[in-house]
């Protein structure tokens, strides 16, 4: 926008064109499947990225409703940021569900504990399986709440000790869970690596 405007294009010309720009999957992606609460998937995986999405969620969530965050931290990356992630979530969220996010050869629950060390007051749950963590968030959400699924965006893999493992992607997991368990509850199945 700034480059176009600096190049002489009037804002009145630029702004209407923004409506035709397609959504970038996994970046501030709202999942709308008819559920009575907000679900936003975002790639945020840095302190600044998390704070920005938390602030946005605060701006769209009524004061009496909850912000529920599902996220983790990548293994073998920026370990000193983990407590900071917890502090930021503690400041903005009402429920924090910590889960795996590219653990590589680290224990996902140990990573979650390091994030949790920055959480002072907010209720938190540790669920290793990313699919199950997303499902838990959807199951506990109430009308008007906002769920944030953070860290992986639309990536369709999870880095583990042995390399890349297929992952359905966060947007696909949300839609699958809504369809299977929220709108049409079915028996338990394992959907960890479904595509």
What are these regions (language model features)?
Residues 2-195:
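ATP-dependent carboxylate-amine ligase
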């Amino acid at each position: 926008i700034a480059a176009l405007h600096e190049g002489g294009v009037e804002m009145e010309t630029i702004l209407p064109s923004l409506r035709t720009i397609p959504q970038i999957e996994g970046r501030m992606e709202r999942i709308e499947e008819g559920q009575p609460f907000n679900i936003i998937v975002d790639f945020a995986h840095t302190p600044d990225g998390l704070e920005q999405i938390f602030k946005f969620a605060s701006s769209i969530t009524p004061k009496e409703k909850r912000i529920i965050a599902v996220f983790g931290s990548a293994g073998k990356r920026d370990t000193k940021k983990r407590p900071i992630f917890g502090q930021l979530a503690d400041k903005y969220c009402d429920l924090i569900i910590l889960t795996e996010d590219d653990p590589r050869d680290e224990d996902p629950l140990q990573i979650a504990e390091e994030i949790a060390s920055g959480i002072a007051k907010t209720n938190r749950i540790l669920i290793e399986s990313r699919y199950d963590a997303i499902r838990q968030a959807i199951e506990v959400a109430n009308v008007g709440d906002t769920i944030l699924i953070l860290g992986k965006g639309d990536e369709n893999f999870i880095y583990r000790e042995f390399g890349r493992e297929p992952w359905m992607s966060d947007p696909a997991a949300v839609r699958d869970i809504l369809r299977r368990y929220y709108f049409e509850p079915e028996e338990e199945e394992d959907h960890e690596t479904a595509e």
